[in-house]
Amino acid sequence: SNEDKTELIYARRELHKICDGKRVDDIQWPIDISNSSGLSFLTYLQASAHFYSENWDQADKSYKEIKNASDPWIREVTSYMIGRNKLKETWNLALGKWGNFKGQTFIKKEPLLEANQAFNSYLSRYPNGQYASSAQGLLRRLIWLSGDKEGLAREYIRLLNTDEFPSATKVTLVKEIDQKLLPLPKSLS
């Protein structure tokens, strides 16, 4: 209904306040959404609020609650966000006080594996989806976070040998290789 749309638009506008430090519990969420599609959108907004608040468990629970929603966009975006949420959980635990990467020893393996599984599931279901390119790049980050330099080197070789990227993007990729991979693993040097 038009009332549902208005309520959901308002709720979406409230979401940016999370980035300004507002707590999820302080947001006035609509309470009278009348249809299942609208409820799925509301749950997506709430899950995203938890994601941006770094409440990984609640975000995961909420995204999974709507992963089979009737709306095709909700199904696709939640499939992607389940992986992104697990990646952020893993990444944040490995950051130091000043945002520096503390190293592979600080990586939690379970969310890393769950993120990998979620992104691969997303890509098998939506190989040309709206978030396919991002999911592919985030899988590359997961390979790096796992410490698999040989796997990362194979992925970089695959990317450099494809026509997926324009030349300008390959320059950025070469810089990434310099930062993440060098020195080369002994088996590849």
Name each model feature, range by range.
Residues 1-189:
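Acidic, polar-rich low-complexity tracts and alpha-helical solenoid repeat scaffolds
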